[in-house]
């Protein structure tokens, strides 16, 4: 059974509001180079390079090679990285608003995720501005499911199954 938990607006580009007009920026991302998020970030960096006629070059550091996933937000806030990509739901312990898109079954399609992102954007922008950050864009995460080595047809089939989750909201399931 592949139960769709919800669509997660996950990848965020952040930049420090106080970033200076540098010509070279480092952009850590926790995802491997072949992940679609990193491929999008790599395209973003190429688009910035083209739009600025090479005056701003963003070096993408994939796979947590510059900062681990849980260190990226603080690195941008502290100016160690000029821009970074994070999984917003991973910061729901700081503020519940960060976990809105992690609420299971709240948005179960890309269309619903887009509506949710638009609805929460003003509040997120305000919260992030207070932290010295600005969300540049968000990317929907594909619908989530339960992956198991054996078929899951009833609740009893889950007995003894080990789980991994990426946020407090999904851990509750």
Where are these regions (language model features)?
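Alpha-to-beta junction loops
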Residues: 53-57, 72-86, 161-164
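Extracytoplasmic "Venus flytrap"
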Residues: 26-43, 63-68
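Short, polar/charged alpha-helical segment
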Residues: 34-59, 119, 123, 172-173
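Gram-negative bacterial Sec-dependent N-terminal signal peptides
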Residues: 1-21
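Immediate post-signal peptide segment of exported/extracytoplasmic ligand-binding proteins
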Residues: 19-29, 49-57, 129, 151-162
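General small-molecule cofactor/ligand-binding pocket signal
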Residues: 59-61, 136
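Contiguous mixed-secondary-structure segments that line small-molecule binding/active-site clefts
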Residues: 45-46, 82, 87-173
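Short helix-initiation/N-cap motifs at beta->coil->alpha
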Residues: 61-74, 166-169
């Amino acid at each position: 059974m592949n139960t769709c938990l919800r669509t997660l607006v996950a990848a965020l580009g952040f930049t420090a509001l106080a970033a200076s007009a540098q010509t070279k920026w480092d952009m850590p991302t926790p995802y491997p180079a072949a992940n679609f998020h990193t491929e999008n970030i790599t395209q973003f960096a190429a688009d910035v390079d083209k739009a600025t006629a090479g005056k701003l070059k963003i070096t993408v550091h994939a796979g947590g090679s510059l900062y681990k996933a849980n260190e990226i937000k603080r690195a941008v806030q502290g100016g160690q990285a000029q821009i970074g990509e994070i999984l917003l739901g991973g910061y729901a312990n700081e503020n519940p608003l960060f976990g809105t898109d992690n609420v299971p079954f709240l948005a179960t399609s890309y269309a619903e995720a887009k509506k949710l992102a638009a609805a929460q954007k003003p509040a997120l922008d305000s919260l992030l501005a207070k932290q010295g950050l600005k969300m540049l864009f968000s990317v929907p995460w594909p619908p989530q499911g339960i992956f198991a080595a054996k078929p899951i047809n009833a609740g009893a089939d889950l007995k003894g199954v080990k789980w991994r989750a990426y946020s407090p909201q999904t851990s509750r399931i």
